[in-house]
């Protein structure tokens, strides 16, 4: 079934019916027009919801898997070998204290927090702010329970 078969467009809304299950789909990043390396962290979170095993191979920036250990704190079953991560989906993620290491990792941790059971605290959100202006405000408008708080252990490094 195609995504367009799951969408209904009404006067003031788009209604999307989710699938009963998400099938795992392995991807390889590539330069345009291939799968963008900037989306592989988010794809990893989607694979956490899938029913089965899939791989993400980053052929552009092979060192962009710093989010995997943090997702592991939330219960993601995955392992990294070189420029590839294997994700074993189907495990419910749990809220945890996690720390973002870069822009892409930070948004993947926010997405993971949105689907996790319990509360997730994402630290070092200054990474997130570099690419997503007032994301918590926008997500709140969509009904997501999210807010910005300051924790000393998550604060940006002080300049000398």
Where are these regions (language model features)?
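Short, structured segments at the rim of ligand-binding sites
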Residues: 4-160
């Amino acid at each position: 079934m195609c995504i367009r078969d799951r969408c209904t467009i009404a006067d003031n809304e788009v209604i999307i019916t989710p699938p009963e299950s998400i099938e795992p789909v392995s991807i390889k990043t590539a330069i345009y027009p291939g799968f963008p390396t900037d989306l592989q962290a988010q794809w990893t979170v989607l694979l956490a919801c899938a029913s089965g095993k899939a791989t993400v191979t980053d052929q552009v920036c092979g060192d962009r898997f710093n989010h995997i250990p943090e997702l592991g704190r939330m219960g993601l079953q995955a392992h990294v070998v070189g420029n590839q991560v294997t994700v074993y989906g189907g495990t419910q993620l749990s809220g945890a204290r996690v720390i973002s290491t870069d822009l892409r990792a930070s948004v993947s941790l926010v997405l993971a927090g949105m689907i996790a059971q319990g509360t997730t605290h994402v630290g070092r959100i200054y990474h997130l702010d570099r690419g997503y202006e007032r994301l918590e405000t926008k997500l709140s408008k969509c009904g997501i329970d999210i807010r910005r708080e300051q924790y000393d252990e998550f604060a940006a490094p002080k300049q000398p």
